[in-house]
UniProtKB/Swiss-Prot annotation:
Topology within the bilayer: Multi-pass membrane protein
Extracellular side: 34-81, 138-159
UniProt gene name: Cldn9
Gene Ontology molecular-function annotations: identical protein binding; structural molecule activity; virus receptor activity
Task performed by this protein: Plays a major role in tight junction-specific obliteration of the intercellular space, through calcium-independent cell-adhesion activity.
Protein name: Claudin-9
Provenance organism: Mus musculus
InterPro entries named in the record: Claudin, Claudin9, Claudin_CS, PMP22/EMP/MP20/Claudin
Length: 217
């Protein structure tokens, strides 16, 4: 029962992490306008995401534009797109595999096979969390580096957007859920079965020596 509860908790955290990753990748809030210097009061705020950029006017009107050309985008943005998509697909696959091998389902009858399936699902979720963490940390590092770079104009400096914080939380949930699924697998299922010990005994020579003695009597 304890392992079943851990499996359900791990899958719940993984689902929340997957949803958080989806929202983080979809929202154009990876980079936002930095309010520094004389730009505390501005007429518009710029939001930048993986798929589009938005401009919010002081009147509340917002205009968004999807990036037209993929090849014209920076390499870090292209890599972030690819990693997020792969992470979403990998996490979804991990969830489906986890449901197949969960203790509360009857898709697989063998307990050893169930344990191996759940372990595979946990590894997939851990990998997906790492794939989410890479573009989020990469983008945050680039934003901070440009923010403190005196050669970058203040109008071009950005701050960390809400999508980055959501991405960190989603990656943590995915890795925590995957770790719980890995912990639910008992090690006894993965030990190689040991056969009976093959021993041998040295035949006693007392009988033979006795016969020899009787022959000489």
């Amino acid at each position: 029962m304890a392992s079943t509860g851990l499996e359900l908790l791990g899958m719940t955290l993984a689902v929340l992490g997957w949803l958080g990753t989806l929202v983080s990748c979809a929202l154009p809030l990876w980079k936002v306008t930095a309010f520094i210097g004389n730009s505390i009061v501005v007429a518009q705020v710029v939001w930048e995401g993986l798929w589009m950029s938005c401009v919010v006017q002081s009147t509340g009107q917002m205009q968004c534009k999807v990036y037209d050309s993929l090849l014209a985008l920076p390499q870090d943005l292209q890599a972030a797109r690819a990693l997020c998509v792969v992470a979403l697909l990998l996490a979804l696959l991990g969830l489906l595999v986890a449901i197949t091998g969960a203790q509360c389902t009857t898709c697989v009858e063998d307990e050893g096979a169930k344990a191996r399936i759940v372990l595979t699902a946990g590894v997939l979720l851990l990998l997906s969390g790492i794939l989410v963490l890479i573009p989020v940390c990469w983008t945050a590092h680039a934003i901070i580096q440009d923010f403190y770079n005196p050669l970058v104009a203040e109008a071009l400096k950005r701050e960390l957007g809400a999508s980055l914080y959501l991405g960190w939380a989603a990656a943590a949930l995915l890795m925590l859920g995957g770790g719980l699924l890995c912990c639910t697998c008992p090690p006894s299922h993965f030990e190689r079965p040991r056969g009976p010990r093959l021993g041998y005994s040295i035949p006693s020579r007392s009988g033979a020596s006795g016969l020899d003695k009787r022959d000489y009597v």
